[in-house]
Protein backbone atom coordinates (compact mmCIF):
# COMPACT_ATOMS: atom_id res chain seq x y z
CA UNK A 1 0.00 0.00 0.00
CA UNK A 2 1.20 3.51 -0.82
CA UNK A 3 0.53 6.07 1.93
CA UNK A 4 0.08 9.80 1.49
CA UNK A 5 2.35 10.44 4.47
CA UNK A 6 5.07 8.61 6.36
CA UNK A 7 5.50 10.18 9.80
CA UNK A 8 8.83 9.49 11.51
CA UNK A 9 8.40 9.72 15.28
CA UNK A 10 5.28 9.34 17.43
CA UNK A 11 5.91 12.19 19.86
CA UNK A 12 3.53 15.13 20.05
CA UNK A 13 4.56 16.65 16.71
CA UNK A 14 4.32 13.39 14.76
CA UNK A 15 1.16 12.15 16.47
CA UNK A 16 -0.71 15.42 15.95
CA UNK A 17 0.29 15.64 12.30
CA UNK A 18 -0.80 12.02 11.77
CA UNK A 19 -4.14 12.71 13.47
CA UNK A 20 -4.82 15.83 11.41
CA UNK A 21 -3.80 14.15 8.14
CA UNK A 22 -6.13 11.21 8.83
CA UNK A 23 -8.95 13.63 9.68
CA UNK A 24 -8.44 15.18 6.22
CA UNK A 25 -8.84 11.75 4.60
CA UNK A 26 -5.14 11.09 4.05
CA UNK A 27 -3.53 7.68 4.56
CA UNK A 28 -0.74 7.75 7.14
CA UNK A 29 1.95 5.38 8.41
CA UNK A 30 3.78 6.29 11.64
CA UNK A 31 7.13 4.68 12.46
CA UNK A 32 9.12 4.99 15.67
CA UNK A 33 12.44 3.42 16.57
CA UNK A 34 11.43 3.04 20.22
CA UNK A 35 9.29 0.13 21.47
CA UNK A 36 6.62 2.62 22.58
CA UNK A 37 4.69 5.60 21.25
CA UNK A 38 4.63 9.16 22.62
CA UNK A 39 8.28 10.20 22.28
CA UNK A 40 9.61 12.01 25.33
CA UNK A 41 6.15 12.52 26.84
CA UNK A 42 5.84 8.73 27.26
CA UNK A 43 4.41 7.70 30.64
CA UNK A 44 4.40 4.15 31.97
CA UNK A 45 2.21 2.82 34.77
CA UNK A 46 4.21 1.24 37.61
CA UNK A 47 2.73 0.41 41.04
CA UNK A 48 -0.33 2.42 39.98
CA UNK A 49 1.84 5.51 39.36
CA UNK A 50 2.13 7.12 35.90
CA UNK A 51 5.90 7.49 35.64
CA UNK A 52 7.22 10.21 33.31
CA UNK A 53 9.91 8.04 31.72
CA UNK A 54 11.78 10.87 29.97
CA UNK A 55 11.55 13.51 32.67
CA UNK A 56 8.79 15.59 34.17
CA UNK A 57 6.31 16.98 31.66
CA UNK A 58 3.92 19.58 33.05
CA UNK A 59 1.58 20.99 30.46
CA UNK A 60 1.15 24.77 30.59
CA UNK A 61 0.08 27.34 28.04
CA UNK A 62 -1.49 30.75 27.53
CA UNK A 63 -2.62 29.74 24.05
CA UNK A 64 -6.34 29.02 24.12
CA UNK A 65 -6.26 27.38 20.68
CA UNK A 66 -3.60 24.91 21.89
CA UNK A 67 -5.48 24.19 25.14
CA UNK A 68 -8.79 23.64 23.36
CA UNK A 69 -7.06 21.36 20.87
CA UNK A 70 -5.17 19.08 23.26
CA UNK A 71 -8.02 18.73 25.77
CA UNK A 72 -10.00 16.90 23.07
CA UNK A 73 -7.67 13.95 23.64
CA UNK A 74 -7.37 13.90 27.44
CA UNK A 75 -8.97 15.32 30.52
CA UNK A 76 -6.38 17.36 32.44
CA UNK A 77 -6.15 17.61 36.22
CA UNK A 78 -5.48 20.85 38.11
CA UNK A 79 -1.80 20.13 38.91
CA UNK A 80 0.17 23.32 39.53
CA UNK A 81 3.94 23.27 39.36
CA UNK A 82 5.42 24.50 42.66
CA UNK A 83 8.95 23.10 42.88
CA UNK A 84 11.08 23.29 46.01
CA UNK A 85 14.80 24.05 46.02
CA UNK A 86 17.06 22.14 48.42
CA UNK A 87 20.39 23.88 49.07
CA UNK A 88 22.43 21.78 51.51
CA UNK A 89 19.31 20.99 53.54
CA UNK A 90 17.82 24.50 53.39
CA UNK A 91 14.47 24.46 51.56
CA UNK A 92 13.35 27.39 49.41
CA UNK A 93 10.32 28.16 47.26
CA UNK A 94 10.65 28.10 43.51
CA UNK A 95 9.79 30.34 41.73
CA UNK A 96 11.69 33.06 43.57
CA UNK A 97 8.94 34.74 45.55
CA UNK A 98 8.26 36.26 48.95
CA UNK A 99 8.68 32.90 50.68
CA UNK A 100 12.15 32.64 49.09
CA UNK A 101 13.14 36.19 50.03
CA UNK A 102 11.86 35.78 53.59
CA UNK A 103 13.90 32.60 54.07
CA UNK A 104 16.99 34.11 52.42
CA UNK A 105 17.05 37.55 54.08
CA UNK A 106 14.31 37.62 56.74
CA UNK A 107 12.43 40.30 54.80
CA UNK A 108 8.66 40.43 55.30
CA UNK A 109 7.28 42.98 52.85
CA UNK A 110 7.57 43.20 49.06
CA UNK A 111 9.14 46.65 49.55
CA UNK A 112 11.94 45.20 51.71
CA UNK A 113 12.52 42.35 49.26
CA UNK A 114 12.64 44.71 46.28
CA UNK A 115 15.12 46.97 48.10
CA UNK A 116 17.38 43.99 48.90
CA UNK A 117 17.30 42.76 45.30
CA UNK A 118 17.94 46.28 43.94
CA UNK A 119 20.89 46.70 46.29
CA UNK A 120 22.44 43.40 45.11
CA UNK A 121 21.64 44.00 41.43
CA UNK A 122 23.88 47.09 41.43
CA UNK A 123 26.85 44.75 41.19
CA UNK A 124 26.07 44.43 37.46
CA UNK A 125 26.17 47.56 35.34
CA UNK A 126 25.23 47.62 31.67
CA UNK A 127 23.92 44.74 29.59
CA UNK A 128 24.59 41.31 31.22
CA UNK A 129 27.28 39.53 29.20
CA UNK A 130 26.59 36.00 30.42
CA UNK A 131 24.27 33.90 32.53
CA UNK A 132 25.99 34.75 35.82
CA UNK A 133 25.61 38.48 35.24
CA UNK A 134 22.04 38.06 34.01
CA UNK A 135 21.07 36.07 37.12
CA UNK A 136 22.66 38.58 39.49
CA UNK A 137 20.93 41.41 37.62
CA UNK A 138 17.59 39.64 38.20
CA UNK A 139 17.83 38.33 41.78
CA UNK A 140 21.13 39.47 43.28
CA UNK A 141 24.24 37.61 44.36
CA UNK A 142 22.80 35.67 47.34
CA UNK A 143 20.01 33.93 45.45
CA UNK A 144 22.29 33.38 42.46
CA UNK A 145 24.94 31.64 44.61
CA UNK A 146 22.51 29.42 46.53
CA UNK A 147 19.71 28.68 44.08
CA UNK A 148 20.93 29.27 40.52
CA UNK A 149 24.65 28.71 40.08
CA UNK A 150 25.17 25.07 41.10
CA UNK A 151 21.93 23.83 39.56
CA UNK A 152 22.55 25.57 36.25
CA UNK A 153 26.17 24.43 36.00
CA UNK A 154 25.07 20.83 36.61
CA UNK A 155 22.31 21.19 34.04
CA UNK A 156 24.50 22.59 31.26
CA UNK A 157 27.88 21.12 32.17
CA UNK A 158 29.63 24.46 31.94
CA UNK A 159 30.47 27.49 34.02
CA UNK A 160 27.73 30.12 34.32
CA UNK A 161 30.18 32.71 32.95
CA UNK A 162 30.33 30.69 29.71
CA UNK A 163 26.56 30.38 29.25
CA UNK A 164 24.43 32.90 27.33
CA UNK A 165 22.35 35.34 29.37
CA UNK A 166 19.01 34.41 27.76
CA UNK A 167 18.80 30.95 29.40
CA UNK A 168 17.96 32.38 32.82
CA UNK A 169 14.90 34.28 31.56
CA UNK A 170 13.05 31.02 32.13
CA UNK A 171 13.20 31.62 35.92
CA UNK A 172 10.21 33.67 37.12
CA UNK A 173 10.76 36.20 39.92
CA UNK A 174 7.86 37.74 41.83
CA UNK A 175 7.16 39.91 44.84
CA UNK A 176 4.09 37.91 45.89
CA UNK A 177 3.50 34.67 47.77
CA UNK A 178 2.37 32.89 44.59
CA UNK A 179 4.07 29.48 44.40
CA UNK A 180 2.83 28.71 40.87
CA UNK A 181 6.02 28.36 38.80
CA UNK A 182 4.31 28.98 35.46
CA UNK A 183 2.49 32.19 34.62
CA UNK A 184 0.07 30.28 32.41
CA UNK A 185 -3.69 30.49 32.06
CA UNK A 186 -3.94 26.73 31.53
CA UNK A 187 -1.94 24.09 33.36
CA UNK A 188 -2.26 20.44 34.30
CA UNK A 189 -1.37 16.81 33.65
CA UNK A 190 -3.50 14.48 31.50
CA UNK A 191 -5.39 12.14 33.81
CA UNK A 192 -4.16 8.60 33.19
CA UNK A 193 -0.87 9.79 31.70
CA UNK A 194 0.46 11.23 28.45
CA UNK A 195 0.71 7.86 26.70
CA UNK A 196 -3.06 7.48 26.85
CA UNK A 197 -3.43 10.95 25.32
CA UNK A 198 -1.10 10.06 22.43
CA UNK A 199 -2.96 6.74 21.95
CA UNK A 200 -6.11 8.82 21.44
CA UNK A 201 -4.33 11.00 18.87
CA UNK A 202 -3.14 7.91 16.98
CA UNK A 203 -6.46 6.06 17.15
CA UNK A 204 -7.08 4.23 13.87
CA UNK A 205 -3.61 5.04 12.46
CA UNK A 206 -1.07 2.36 11.54
CA UNK A 207 1.99 2.56 13.80
CA UNK A 208 5.15 0.47 13.45
CA UNK A 209 7.34 0.47 16.55
CA UNK A 210 10.96 -0.73 16.83
CA UNK A 211 11.43 0.65 13.31
CA UNK A 212 14.50 2.80 12.71
CA UNK A 213 13.67 5.04 9.77
CA UNK A 214 17.28 5.91 8.96
CA UNK A 215 18.26 2.22 8.82
CA UNK A 216 15.42 1.42 6.41
CA UNK A 217 15.12 4.80 4.71
CA UNK A 218 14.89 3.71 1.06
CA UNK A 219 12.22 1.06 1.62
CA UNK A 220 10.17 3.29 3.96
CA UNK A 221 10.42 6.32 1.65
CA UNK A 222 9.06 4.16 -1.16
CA UNK A 223 5.88 3.57 0.89
CA UNK A 224 4.74 7.20 0.93
CA UNK A 225 4.35 10.30 -1.21
CA UNK A 226 5.72 12.57 1.50
CA UNK A 227 7.67 12.27 4.78
CA UNK A 228 7.23 14.20 8.04
CA UNK A 229 10.53 13.73 9.88
CA UNK A 230 10.77 14.56 13.61
CA UNK A 231 14.15 12.97 14.31
CA UNK A 232 17.50 14.81 14.60
CA UNK A 233 18.14 16.85 11.46
CA UNK A 234 21.89 16.13 11.45
CA UNK A 235 21.26 12.36 11.66
CA UNK A 236 18.97 12.60 8.62
CA UNK A 237 21.91 13.88 6.59
CA UNK A 238 24.35 11.34 8.04
CA UNK A 239 26.08 14.02 10.16
CA UNK A 240 27.94 15.03 7.01
CA UNK A 241 28.41 18.65 8.10
CA UNK A 242 29.18 17.72 11.72
CA UNK A 243 27.20 16.85 14.83
CA UNK A 244 24.81 19.26 16.52
CA UNK A 245 25.29 19.34 20.29
CA UNK A 246 22.64 18.57 22.90
CA UNK A 247 22.40 18.28 26.62
CA UNK A 248 21.21 14.86 27.67
CA UNK A 249 19.53 13.71 30.85
CA UNK A 250 19.62 10.33 32.53
CA UNK A 251 17.30 9.03 35.20
CA UNK A 252 17.78 6.69 38.11
CA UNK A 253 14.34 5.36 39.03
CA UNK A 254 13.60 3.80 42.39
CA UNK A 255 10.42 2.25 43.79
CA UNK A 256 10.06 2.84 47.53
CA UNK A 257 7.80 0.93 49.88
CA UNK A 258 6.63 4.15 51.56
CA UNK A 259 3.70 6.42 50.68
CA UNK A 260 5.62 9.72 50.62
CA UNK A 261 9.30 10.45 49.94
CA UNK A 262 9.54 14.24 49.60
CA UNK A 263 5.98 15.59 49.69
CA UNK A 264 6.29 17.35 46.33
CA UNK A 265 6.51 16.39 42.66
CA UNK A 266 9.83 18.19 42.10
CA UNK A 267 12.70 19.09 44.41
CA UNK A 268 15.69 20.80 42.78
CA UNK A 269 19.11 20.23 44.35
CA UNK A 270 20.84 23.55 43.81
CA UNK A 271 24.27 22.91 45.32
CA UNK A 272 27.13 21.86 43.04
CA UNK A 273 28.14 18.84 45.17
CA UNK A 274 24.91 16.78 44.96
CA UNK A 275 25.34 14.92 41.65
CA UNK A 276 21.67 14.94 40.61
CA UNK A 277 19.88 18.11 39.53
CA UNK A 278 16.51 17.17 40.95
CA UNK A 279 14.33 14.37 42.27
CA UNK A 280 10.89 13.82 40.80
CA UNK A 281 8.26 11.98 42.86
CA UNK A 282 5.80 11.02 40.14
CA UNK A 283 2.71 10.23 42.21
CA UNK A 284 2.26 13.91 43.17
CA UNK A 285 1.56 14.85 39.53
CA UNK A 286 -1.77 13.11 40.17
CA UNK A 287 -2.09 14.02 43.87
CA UNK A 288 -0.89 10.64 45.15
CA UNK A 289 -4.01 8.83 43.97
CA UNK A 290 -4.94 6.31 41.30
CA UNK A 291 -7.67 6.95 38.73
CA UNK A 292 -10.33 5.71 41.18
CA UNK A 293 -9.22 8.21 43.82
CA UNK A 294 -7.49 5.65 46.06
CA UNK A 295 -4.25 6.54 47.87
CA UNK A 296 -1.22 4.79 46.37
CA UNK A 297 0.74 2.86 49.01
CA UNK A 298 4.13 3.01 47.25
CA UNK A 299 6.03 5.81 45.58
CA UNK A 300 8.43 6.05 42.65
CA UNK A 301 11.20 8.62 42.48
CA UNK A 302 13.57 9.58 39.67
CA UNK A 303 16.93 11.16 40.32
CA UNK A 304 17.77 13.28 37.31
CA UNK A 305 21.33 13.80 36.10
CA UNK A 306 22.38 16.12 33.29
CA UNK A 307 25.13 14.97 30.99
CA UNK A 308 26.95 15.89 27.81
CA UNK A 309 25.31 14.16 24.89
CA UNK A 310 27.24 11.52 22.97
CA UNK A 311 26.20 9.26 20.10
CA UNK A 312 23.62 6.76 21.34
CA UNK A 313 22.31 8.99 24.15
CA UNK A 314 18.86 10.54 24.05
CA UNK A 315 19.14 14.16 22.88
CA UNK A 316 17.08 16.45 25.12
CA UNK A 317 18.00 20.13 24.96
CA UNK A 318 19.59 21.77 21.92
CA UNK A 319 22.68 23.80 22.84
CA UNK A 320 21.55 26.98 21.12
CA UNK A 321 24.88 28.78 21.03
CA UNK A 322 26.39 30.54 18.03
CA UNK A 323 28.44 27.58 16.79
CA UNK A 324 25.49 25.16 16.85
CA UNK A 325 23.17 27.81 15.44
CA UNK A 326 25.43 28.26 12.42
CA UNK A 327 25.70 24.50 11.89
CA UNK A 328 21.92 24.13 12.11
CA UNK A 329 21.59 26.91 9.52
CA UNK A 330 23.67 24.84 7.10
CA UNK A 331 21.57 21.72 7.75
CA UNK A 332 18.42 23.83 7.29
CA UNK A 333 19.66 24.83 3.82
CA UNK A 334 20.00 21.13 2.96
CA UNK A 335 16.57 20.39 4.46
CA UNK A 336 14.94 23.11 2.35
CA UNK A 337 16.18 21.32 -0.78
CA UNK A 338 14.64 17.99 0.29
CA UNK A 339 11.43 18.01 -1.69
CA UNK A 340 8.81 15.79 -0.17
CA UNK A 341 10.23 15.96 3.38
CA UNK A 342 8.94 18.20 6.18
CA UNK A 343 11.28 18.61 9.17
CA UNK A 344 9.52 19.39 12.44
CA UNK A 345 9.69 19.31 16.21
CA UNK A 346 12.48 19.83 18.71
CA UNK A 347 15.00 17.57 16.96
CA UNK A 348 13.92 18.22 13.38
CA UNK A 349 14.17 21.99 13.88
CA UNK A 350 16.96 21.93 16.53
CA UNK A 351 14.86 24.19 18.71
CA UNK A 352 13.87 24.31 22.37
CA UNK A 353 10.13 23.65 22.35
CA UNK A 354 7.80 23.31 25.30
CA UNK A 355 4.82 21.02 24.70
CA UNK A 356 2.46 23.89 23.92
CA UNK A 357 4.83 25.49 21.39
CA UNK A 358 5.32 22.09 19.76
CA UNK A 359 1.54 21.80 19.37
CA UNK A 360 1.23 25.36 18.01
CA UNK A 361 4.05 24.68 15.54
CA UNK A 362 2.56 21.44 14.18
CA UNK A 363 -0.96 22.92 13.94
CA UNK A 364 0.45 25.82 11.90
CA UNK A 365 2.28 23.35 9.68
CA UNK A 366 -0.91 21.29 9.25
CA UNK A 367 -2.78 24.39 8.08
CA UNK A 368 -0.14 25.02 5.41
CA UNK A 369 0.27 21.40 4.39
CA UNK A 370 -3.27 20.02 4.71
CA UNK A 371 -5.35 23.18 4.28
Name the predicted role of every residue range.
Residues 85-92, 99-226, 230, 235-237:
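Active-site/ligand-binding neighborhood in enzyme catalytic cores
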Residues 24, 214-334:
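Mid-domain catalytic core of redox enzymes
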